[in-house]
Regions:
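Catalytic phosphate/metal-binding cores of nucleic-acid and nucleotide-processing enzymes, i.e., regions
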Residues: 1-113
Length: 113
């Protein structure tokens, strides 16, 4: 991959998919260029939200949350989350997750099913 930023993003997506698989979720990285953007990580379980993965030095939380809301609709999911790499932390288990409060409550209450 010639673009270092794309390579960085792809590596972060693979790391998240691998971590979710280790945790017992069937997760796969969605190839770039799909006609309908459903997010970066696909988990067949409909109760799981759409997932957007970010590895950027500059945060754009509002923009990312807006984007993942569109991806959630495209994926047929009620909600979406953004997983973003934490500086200095290679293990996705310690990365951040961003979503709206409404999304958080929906996930906690299990209404995403």
């Amino acid at each position: 991959m010639s673009n270092p930023n794309k390579a960085k993003g792809s590596a972060a997506e693979r790391a998240v998919a691998d971590y979710l698989n280790v945790r017992g979720l069937e997760a796969e990285r969605v190839p770039a260029g799909a006609s309908l953007d459903r997010g970066d990580i696909w988990v067949p379980d409909k109760s799981f939200p759409a997932v957007q993965v970010k590895n950027h030095a500059r945060l754009d939380l509002a923009g990312w949350v807006d984007d993942v809301a569109i991806q959630a609709k495209n994926a047929g999911r009620e909600t979406g989350i953004v997983i973003h790499k934490r500086r200095g932390k290679g293990n996705p288990a310690s990365w951040y997750v961003t979503c709206t409060l409404d999304t958080l409550i929906t996930l906690i209450e299990g209404k995403n099913r």
